Amino acid sequence: MDQSLANGVGGASIERNTTETRIRVAVNLDGTGVYDVKTGVGFLDHMLEQLSRHSLMDLSVAAEGDVHIDAHHTTEHSGIAIGQAVAKAVGDRKGIQRYGHAYVPMDETLTRVALDFSNRPYLIWKVSFSRDKIGDMDTELFREWFQAFAMAAGVTLHVECLYGENNHHIVESCYKALARALRAGIEIDPRKRDAVPSTKGTLGGSL
């Protein structure tokens, strides 16, 4: 998947090994939403599958982590690796729309996500839960994943659940809204295919 595609952004792969996790990620940003996700954390797999399906990003994740302790390292490190792969795939960010946003309803829940491929990573997270766990995951870990993804991908990311009651619906709408915003942000602008979407001629400063 580590290739540049003629009509879009392209693909990339990342391998990230630490004493806590071993993770291999491949993405194709010009895909159709095909996924193969195995993190060892069932609910995280479910969320990453939603990310792939609704962004149309093909996503392969193979992770081995210290889940006998808890899911923290696998969750955070998968966010880092996916973010790194996305950043590698978009490269110098020439031709992309850069900005993306989405509102996603899920029954009683409504979530808004806005992002900027600014190369100035930042996360605003306005999401709260009424339970400590969803499935096999601590709810506090979802912020860790979004933080890790934003930092590694080099995106400014705002995630806000406007209202909702069901905790599963809340977090799933966050991933689906991220997916739709990501899809919009990486879309190629045919009028500016060879231009970086910034008056500076480059994006970022800290990365």
UniProtKB/Swiss-Prot annotation:
**Got a GO cellular component term for this one?**
cytoplasm
Q: What is its EC number?
A: 4.2.1.19
User: Which pathway is this protein engaged in?
Assistant: Amino-acid biosynthesis; L-histidine biosynthesis; L-histidine from 5-phospho-alpha-D-ribose 1-diphosphate: step 6/9
Q: Per the record, what are the reactions this protein catalyses?
A: D-erythro-1-(imidazol-4-yl)glycerol 3-phosphate = 3-(imidazol-4-yl)-2-oxopropyl phosphate + H2O
Sorted keywords for this record are: Amino-acid biosynthesis, Cytoplasm, Histidine biosynthesis, Lyase
What protein family is recorded?
A: Belongs to the imidazoleglycerol-phosphate dehydratase family.
> Mainly localized where?
cytoplasm
Look at the named UniProt entry and state the broad enzyme category this protein falls under: lyase
SUPFAM superfamilies hit by this protein: Ribosomal protein S5 domain 2-like
A Pfam family of the record is: IGPD
InterPro entries under this entry?
Answer: IGPD_sf, ImidazoleglycerolP_deHydtase, ImidazoleglycerP_deHydtase_CS, Ribosomal_Su5_D2-typ_SF
Where it sits in the cell: the answer is: Cytoplasm
One of its GO biological process terms is:
L-histidine biosynthetic process
What GO terms are given for molecular function?
Answer: imidazoleglycerol-phosphate dehydratase activity
Q: Which PROSITE patterns match?
A: IGP_DEHYDRATASE_1, IGP_DEHYDRATASE_2
Q: Specify the species.
A: Azospirillum brasilense
Mind telling me what this protein is named? Imidazoleglycerol-phosphate dehydratase
- Note the superkingdom of the native organism: Bacteria
